[in-house]
């Protein structure tokens, strides 16, 4: 997230380690100096996006943090996708709302994009997170791929540290986001995991 104290340092470290850096962009109802809100003019939205990109060096892509109100705004999402395309970036729709038009706007201009299938940690218990990971594994077997979103909560990290080494035995390969975009051919999976 661009407004966190160590965003730039973490982005540099991730880039140095060969990881894909993404901006986790705050969107309404999220607040803060970078957050996009429906009442803002395009110039303000673009200014906040540019500031966020400066705050997170090496960003190759962007996804929405919260954004249930913002991602349902067609004009703002078209503006965002056009700007990301000009920067050669990709977009991952966190799908915080069933009314989102973000992925559709990305796809309409051919912007590399994905949509989330499973949230790992809406409920922050080890048991619930492990259950969501099992749901994701089942979905991956059913539809071929699955996009998972989680947070660096201690419970999430505990589950991932325990379970990631076991994925291959379960017939699942953990792949980078750019590879997933290639696997899905820039098309959203039917019903986005529902």
Regions found by a protein language model. Name each.
Residues 1-194:
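Catalytic-site microenvironment of enzymes
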